[in-house]
Amino acid sequence: MEVSVEHLGGVQFEIKARQHTIACDQPPENGGYDEGMTPPELLLASLGSCVGFYAAMYLKKHKLSLGGTRVHVTAEKARAPARMENFRITVEVPGEFSHDHKRGIKEAAHQCLIHNTLLNPPKISLEVQSVALLGDLRI
């Protein structure tokens, strides 16, 4: 898996993966124009959409309605070091479901790659490289 993130100016970035593009920005109080989600919001979105995928797969497998299903994700900011903590995920599925199906949806959501990555922190390496530029072109 790979994404590229390019600085557009100010505190704005363009994120690309395959043929998809997402804008990342900051609200005005952080020097941005609020034209895209912030990095922490993108993390919450990643977790929520991943959990939603697994919940939808469970519903589909059991021939249950998945229209209108929503996932809400919240987290709190923590300091020292700066990070997010106390993630809370709520899966809202329209209609009435048995306790077994609610448990099944929860178990399916626990298969989410992002959820499991956050629960089992990966090793992260960081490298800084100098690149030569000719105008806007990298050479």
What are these regions (language model features)?
Residues 50-51:
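Alpha-helical metal-binding/catalytic segments enriched in His/Glu/Asp
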Residues 1-45, 55-139:
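Extended beta-strand/beta-hairpin segments
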